[in-house]
Amino acid sequence: MKFTKYVTLNNRKIIIIGFGSIGPAALLLILRHVDINPNAIEIISDSNKNQDIAENNAIKFLHFKLSPENYENYLSLKLTQNDILINLSVEISSIDLIKLCQKMSVLYLDTSNEAWPSEITGTRTGTYERRQNMQQETNNFSKEVTALVCHGANPGLITHFAKQAVLDVRNSIKNIASVPHTADEWADIAQASDIIALHISERDTQVSTVKRLADEYVNTWSIEGLFEEASENVGFAWGTHEEELPKEMVKNRMDGEKCRIIELNQVAIETQIKSWVPSKGMFTGFLMPHVEAYSIAELFSRKVSNNRYQPTVHFVYHPCLDAIDSMRHAMAQGWVNINHKRLLGDDILEGKDELGILVVRRHTPDIYWFGSRLDIKEARNLIPHNNATSVQVAIGILSGLVWIIENPQCGLVEPEQVDFKRVLEIAEPYLGEFGGYWAKWPEEHFPKITGHALKRHFYNSSKEVT
């Protein structure tokens, strides 16, 4: 089968850091769609897992653990001007890697804003704090070298889904052909469409033929990443339409210049809320802290004098059932001794990953969901030996990679500054059933206002997610 080559790299190297749950799929997509000699790709990983996949594709695999003490010297010997660094690791500082890339005029891409482990730094930083730290470094970064942060599935593709969803809702009200170019223009559309909330809505129903053991931790993507999110206090973008929450629910509230933030006195695994996906309709998921909740909210917010508009933006996630059981077991163990881990892959019998944006509006029960519904069978046809989740993340990586190669002089950027039409053009063939769905929100049963829903859960905290 002949694949489209979106970009050509001559005499340039790609270095990939980390080769766990997503790396193999991302590598295959790069080999398919980037015109590059496999000898110009190197993988650095602190584990020899998946080494055979790299070597079977004639890719150099280096088993090495990067640390704050050695990363600069080690990578400086590997990288030269105009090369590309793709960071798919956990607990390797994104800021430090970007600083090095900027100094060496190397393009940078990652899927998550990572920090060095708390055992090294002495502190654990949360999702919002890591983003703030990154933004504070912006003035220290060169505007001449692109560094695209947080561009996988979510964060990443979900921002482009959000833009398309908001345009679809606007066009359902008043057919306007123009596409916004500035944050104020996007905010105008959202406000004029009476949008009060954007749910990042994901439900994973992939089921393994292998039963989870009592002391085993299972997931369809990074187990460490899932547990880090589940054990963090819930934080998200708090819309201007929301009422105050009772003081006992709130840990922190910030009215920033660009975004209103709220942090709850509960960790994510203890906090549930309703959302909607096409296959199930209404479902209960965990309210997970995710960086795109803040960046998407900023895209659709605006402030003129004392008048401010911002929708609530949060991530409602229903992991696969084995992952839910694993999270609860890990919490009962105090999130320590997470030794026996298993990623679901060829053992998956059935199921899909539905990932999209749910648009909720004031004064109407009509809701609109736009996104990807990728079944495990189609995922395997697209990229063998992968699952639906890894394919969605991997195509986010490829589309981000193509964009930074085509736009090499943009400085530090988040997905909101990326051309969403270009990304969706590249990603769509790998997203399964891709498009929008209209439905009705049954408000008589489930509060549409996030604050009302959270109060209902807080004072009636039965475990609904199953």
Description of each model-found segment:
Residues 168-466:
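C-terminal catalytic/substrate-binding lobe primarily of soluble NAD(P)-dependent oxidoreductases
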Residues 56-69:
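Rossmann-fold cofactor-recognition segment
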Residues 1-11:
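A short, basic/flexible loop-to-alpha-helix module at the beginning of a structural domain
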Residues 35-55:
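NAD(P)-binding Rossmann-fold cofactor-contacting core
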Residues 22-25:
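Hydrophobic/small residue at the entry helix of a nucleotide-binding pocket
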Residues 66-79:
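Conserved Rossmann-fold cofactor-binding substructure of NAD(P)-dependent oxidoreductases
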Residues 15-20:
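Conserved N-terminal Rossmann-fold NAD(P)-binding element of oxidoreductases
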Residues 95-106, 111-145:
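Rossmann-fold NAD(P)-binding glycine/threonine-rich loop
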